[in-house]
């Protein structure tokens, strides 16, 4: 199934609330309108002030999102962009997100 951004927002809202995540931004193929049945769903999320702290809670959050959507999910925290591997890597990620993004929660 290929979801609209509105459907994605509706499905992830309970999960985001459960984990106290304040904002989730859709990017990648779904944000560009190029998703296929095999596409994963890419999110940038704000973890500051949330219950998503540490590797185990990030994995629980990702699994809860995957269960809500029935699709694989990739996550990048907004805060992690500040410590990206190097400036070139950070620029690549940020430019890709900036050019095709949609706030779906928060």
Report each predicted region and the residues it spans.
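Catalytic core of pol beta-like nucleotidyltransferases
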Residues: 1-23, 32-33, 37, 48-106
